[in-house]
Amino acid sequence: MDGVSSLPNELLCHILSFLTTKEAALTSILSKRWRNLIAFVPNLYIDDTVFLHPEEGKRDRPEIIQSFMDFVDRILALQGNYPIKKCSLKCLTEVDSVRVDAWISNVLARGVTDLDLLIILDCESDDNYRLSPKCLQSSTLVSLKIDGGIDIARVDNFDILLLALPALEELALVDVIWKDEDDYPLVNMKNLFDARIIFMLQLPGAREPDDDHWFDQNVALRYSNVWKLFLGLQNVPNLYLSPDTLKVLSLYCESMPVFKNLKSLAIKSGKERGWQAIPVLLRNCPHLETLVIEGVLHNVTDKCGDACDCISREDKGRSLTSCPVKMLEIRGFRGTMKEMTMMKHFLDYFLCLKAMNIYVEENDPTELRFPEVSKCIMQMMEEYNKLSSCNVELLVTDYFYFSEKWTAKGRIL
């Protein structure tokens, strides 16, 4: 008997839970001992791209698709009412939507806590999978991801959907079809732990002008009710905002809610987007502890606000001085003097700051590849640490001139 087969069933099922459901099912041919273990695997990874033959055209044959659906039916029937923790369902072929409904209902009835759906019935048409509200009624579901053009237009009230999921903490909606794409739901997502808000806007030119008129009337109208979405997120402890999301927020700063429970805020900046929304955002986070900024370089406008050092103003840094943030992470650092000026600005005006971690850009070349620049940056960091009680650290990887972690106090960690 080999060492693996001598393991207890519970441990074998745990090992199988890391495989795709097809791979786990194939182990049944090893011996009688393995034949029914698939019935007790707590995780399901059902992916028709893994099950179906990858050869061109073969996967679209009706008999192949039918065999995939029959396989899923057999697995679910074999498992019966055995509890399930996680289910990932990926269907990119013309499977029967009625059977998809049944599969989703099956795992929900068995107490699934993590559900990931990617369903595209027909890639060449607008025939989207229509998610029935009856398929999303669960007292155990904690994490839900809906992806791939799934139509939730039949869900008349989004708040009703969330009320049917009282334990939900993580919700991701990617490329879904809404009943009214110009409106946003006003719901209280009080259990939500982590929110990532990513809007995608189309600029009329390469860069935005210095005023807000670059939005045409139709686009502005589309986001006129966005405040309702953020009002429902005001209790979230962790929030991530994309560059376009910051731009949308800048149009409706007066409606921005107070995020009274927010502890960690992550912002991705962009050279084509300004920082108009950041001052109000920081003032509306009274208990913020960690701030992450990915890319401090941004588009400078006359309404950039007092959060940056781009334009001289009397109220410079006012929103920073009132912010209680203790940890600041800067990501995507390129080693430019403009970035270093921003670091000094943060050190001067974030009065509660205890630590600043600066992560060097890893995907593109930076100025740090030049020895004279890296030496200058180290000297400036050294000076910053002398002038501030905040501990400034530069974290880099795969750079010849730096160790894995260097502190401005001159220590190699």
From Swiss-Prot:
* Highest taxon, organism lineage: Eukaryota
Checking SMART domains in the record gives: FBD, FBOX
Where does the signal sequence lie?
none
Q: Which PROSITE patterns match?
A: FBOX
Q: Which Pfam families match?
A: F-box (PF00646)
> Could you tell me which residue ranges the F-box domain spans?
1-48
Q: Which CDD domains match?
A: F-box_AtFBL13-like (cd22160)
Name of this protein: Putative F-box protein At3g58820
